[in-house]
Amino acid sequence: MAGNMLANYVQVYVMLPLDVVSVDNKFEKGDEIRAQLKKLTEAGVDGVMIDVWWGLVEGKGPKAYDWSAYKQVFDLVHEAGLKLQAIMSFHQCGGNVGDVVNIPIPQWVRDVGATDPDIFYTNRGGTRNIEYLTLGVDDQPLFHGRTAVQMYADYMASFRENMKKFLDAGTIVDIEVGLGPAGEMRYPSYPQSQGWVFPGIGEFICYDKYLEADFKAAAAKAGHPEWELPDDAGEYNDTPEKTQFFKDNGTYLTEKGKFFLSWYSNKLIKHGDKILDEANKVFLGCRVQLAIKISGIHWWYRVPNHAAELTAGYYNLDDRDGYRTIARMLTRHHASMNFTCAEMRDSEQSEEAKSAPEELVQQVLSAGWREGLHVACENALGRYDATAYNTILRNARPKGINKNGPPEHKLFGFTYLRLSNELLEGQNYATFQTFVEKMHANLGHDPSVDPVAPLERSKPEMPIEMILKAAQPKLEPFPFDKNTDLPVKDHTDVGDEVLVAPV
């Protein structure tokens, strides 16, 4: 029976603090992290996830990598007997929800922007976003002779070379490739650093000269040289109906609007495809899984225009699946999809935001599973309460436990945001331990579950037309039960109050 039940086991990881390595690339919290890892091990956790910041490791100059601090952290993780998910963090820390520290991208890269500010994502008003390089420079050799994609590939190759010990030992099991702000495959359409507040629709971010030239060339090729980038899509904190682009029968439904949205979302898919191809070459043969993260943009999901998703680059409408296209691209690289907001309930959201996190999770997970992917999840906000854990448990096994073998569907893993002393104290720790136990189908910790095979080479390039076939028809998501069949009991005695903590 235990053998059959093991197929229901979902691995649990915990995200390490953003500043586990200091802003001057030193590891100074050895005793604190060692003690915290011990408590995670005692709770039965499978592993941890860590941001490996580009701005720290290659901060001193082109190819002047310094991995020493990360090697010290990885040694502690290895000693604790935990697995490790490493994020190739090519973005800035600072400017997004939960960012408590500021780690910019390398100064020598930003210096290129002093003479060519178009290396950064730009909104229609001309404001630059320095969190991540625009995908418009993916193939532009502007960085001491290298393109952006070459810089990312070289960084990953140096990581593989320097972390060979941990790759060979099976400590590092997952390489999550950062593809945009907050490490997510999206445009920086809702930057808090520029005044965006929830539930603003965000803005299209494609007005740097490189993306603008690309759009003009694409429009001319399509026989419409007169088409320009949108000028009617509003500003960060607008509601959809305030804009000509997103209102009922707005621009987004016209030939011109559809052309723009296809171009905008396809550029993002090609960006991910290109960088994953490099990652696959670098980690070929390693026992690791490649992964990307998709942002959980749950606001304005319940209106036909899905405005906030569209500005982020997810061309998702009621009759078009904007996530299955991404999933199909991932199949080429044997990569997995990591999604967020796994803890959210619709009932916790404000009515004005037209938010539907539960339906969004259902759609995205179903899209990944239909394409045969491993799908993982995270929580968006720090929570310690049974309600949140039970929502995660429901999403981890949507139709519950199967005592005779694999469940109909299950998450490949779940990563909890984020490690803190608060998580490891008193009732919070006790509830978290119970949650881990339930994710493990009450079987206790088992490191042999879901072993990772050596990474195979990416399949031949997939034409964008084949990828886009996944968008329509938009199929109904797989059914999800309302509640989990292995719930965490609520011991918090706070009634219906939701405990929310900063991540």
Swiss-Prot record:
InterPro entries: Glyco_hydro_14, Glyco_hydro_14_CS, Glyco_hydro_14B_pln, Glycoside_hydrolase_SF
Catalysed reactions, semicolon-separated: Hydrolysis of (1->4)-alpha-D-glucosidic linkages in polysaccharides so as to remove successive maltose units from the non-reducing ends of the chains
Keywords recorded for this protein, A-Z: Allergen, Carbohydrate metabolism, Glycosidase, Hydrolase, Polysaccharide degradation
Matching Pfam families: Glyco_hydro_14 (PF01373)
Keyword Hydrolase in annotation: yes
GO molecular function ontology, one term from the record: beta-amylase activity
UniProt cross-references to Gene3D superfamilies, sorted A to Z: Glycosidases (3.20.20.80)
Active-site residues from the entry: 184, 378
GO biological process: polysaccharide catabolic process
EC number: 3.2.1.2
PANTHER family per record: BETA-AMYLASE, BETA-AMYLASE 1, CHLOROPLASTIC
Name used for this protein in its record: Beta-amylase Tri a 17
